[in-house]
Amino acid sequence: MTTFPMPDSIINGKATTPAVLPDRNTHQGKEPIPHPPPPEVAKEEMMAAVRTILLNVGEDPDREGLLKTPKRVAEAMQFLTSGYSQSLETLVNGAIFDEGHDEMVLVRDINFFSLCEHHMLPFIGKAHVAYIPNQRVIGLSKLARVVEMYARRLQVQERLTRQVAEAIETVLDPKGVAVVMEATHMCMVMRGVQKPGSWTVTSSMLGVFREDQKTREEFLNLIRHQPNF
């Protein structure tokens, strides 16, 4: 876990400890549940919860159209949160190669979907992922799979963007990583402010992308450019 220096704060006459940044696999510095229930047990419990929701919105869960709804919703939730059962090491699976390449590698327009952790409504968009190798490169499909793994969890877009960047930095130790994500959030479209057409853009720049303006501008220009195919 990474700590960053900050002035001591005084609460009830005592100095607090330095703030701790959450690891990419944790939330607010707390470890995830170490032993989630087996998939079939989790599925049964989710089905019961969905049935309770149906009853409390005024529906009859025993009518024909809703008989299989708890099962369908539980299976959908297991799929949409399948990133919790994946690990970075297993996902990469050794697909790192010493190619001696030291110029930017960019995979853009990676479609993704995730669930907002506040309302459990979808947000959908595109990710643009780039890195400058330190001689080693990773299989291109793995960049998309890293996005997918972290997106298939309950998320906020800001954290998702940072997690993807830090994961690539961890497995490659490159000269720099840049990630930009653009998404529309159903929690802003279907409820609350109800603003269809609004997009949220987040970025995470590490290494030379953060330190060197020309490198950062090259990346931003490349993701603005529309391909001719």
Swiss-Prot record:
InterPro entries: GTP-CH-I_C/QueF, GTP-CH-I_N, GTP_CycHdrlase_I, GTP_CycHdrlase_I_CS, GTP_CycHdrlase_I_dom. Pfam families: GTP_cyclohydroI. Pathway: Cofactor biosynthesis; 7,8-dihydroneopterin triphosphate biosynthesis; 7,8-dihydroneopterin triphosphate from GTP: step 1/1. Residues 24-33 have a biased composition (Basic and acidic residues). Keywords: GTP-binding, Hydrolase, Metal-binding, Nucleotide-binding, One-carbon metabolism, Zinc. Residues 1-40 are annotated as: Disordered. Its EC number is 3.5.4.16. One of its GO terms (molecular function) is zinc ion binding. Zn(2+) binds at residues 116, 119, 187. Signal peptide: none annotated. It is an enzyme of class 3 (hydrolase). HAMAP family: FolE. Belongs to the GTP cyclohydrolase I family. Toroid-shaped homodecamer, composed of two pentamers of five dimers. This is GTP cyclohydrolase 1.
